[in-house]
Each structure stands twice: as structure tokens, then as C-alpha cells.
Amino acid sequence: MSAVDEQNQPNLNYFNTMPSWQHYVSRTPKEFYDWYNGVSEEVAEFEVAELIRLSGDRKVIVDTNIPLDTLYKIAEPNHVAVMLSPQSMSVASFFNRGDPEKQFLLKEIEKCSNPEAAFENFKACIASVNNPEVYEAYLHSGFFTLIRENTERDTREEVFQKLAEHFELN
């Protein structure tokens, strides 16, 4: 039995009900934005429970999309790090990473009847969830924030070092 059901978590259940992957990559930016934020809200309760379970008597570091309003309720500012990059960077570099999920989506886009239009549309979808209002909300959230503006200059090692200092892991 799954803890996710269509009635209580329609956004998390989307992948069980979507017509096709081409439909997924062809939604409007507004539909994608609403779905993405719905998923963040719906999954937060599961993520918080898992964080409590994992943390026990140790520190854990996770990459999550827990919404700010939830983070304010459950975490001290020094227990959160927000990582931001400009919208242009997040959109331009989305498919440049080699992770299998991104490459899978790229292949699904190529299967669309008009792959170029589908690609541009999906980039607009990514831009919608990385819009300036969202960026500003995270930037001014009161949480520790790292801004990555240059993939060549801002190395992983530097980012890890800044995070280690923030979380007092050194």
C-alpha cells in the first residue's frame, strides 16, 4: 500500500496518471509551475518525517524542496542553507548535467512531434519555477544563502567548503 493517493496528493500522483512523458514535457509553464509547487507542498510532510528519522543523534544534509513556510516552522536559520543561481543559469544548464533523469527528459522531448518547440517550452517551464519572485523570496528568507553565478568560477569544492563552515562541520 502506498502512502501517496490521488485524492490527497494529486501532484505526487501525477506520474501514475499522466497520459505520456510527451504530455509531461509539453505542459504550459503555468501548469508546470502549479504542479511543481503542489509537489513541494505534498512531499514536505514525508520529507520532514524522513528527516526526523534520519537525523536521530546526528547531522544530516539533504537537498530538498521543502517550502519556505514549512522551513520557518521546523528549522533554525543556521540549520538551513539555500542555494541559488540566476534563472538564466538554471535554465541554460538544466540539460548540461549528465544525470540520468535529465537525459531521459531530453530523449522524451526529442520524441515530441515538434522537438524544438517542446524543448523551448520545457525551458520556459524550468524558468517558471525559477522565476525572479521565487529567487527573491529565497534570497531574503533569512536563511544562509549561497549564490552560484558562474559554473567555472564557483567550484563544487568551494561550495562544499562554504556549506561545511555554515553547518560547522570542520
Regions found by a protein language model. Give the residues of each.
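Conserved nucleotide-binding/hydrolysis micro-motifs of P-loop NTPases
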Residues: 66-68, 85-91, 152-153
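ATP-dependent small-molecule kinase phosphotransfer cores
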Residues: 2-59, 66
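Conserved catalytic network of the ASCE P-loop NTPase/AAA+ motor domain
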Residues: 52-55, 73-77
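Helical/strand "switch-coupling" subdomains that flank nucleotide/phosphate-binding cores, especially
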Residues: 60-64, 71, 145
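A solvent-exposed, charged loop/short amphipathic helix patch at secondary-structure junctions
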Residues: 16-33, 98-120
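Alpha-helix-centered segments that form part of catalytic cores
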Residues: 34-49, 116-140
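Conserved phosphate-donor/acceptor-positioning beta-strand/loop module used by diverse small-molecule
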Residues: 75-114
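NTP-dependent small-molecule kinase module
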Residues: 128-170
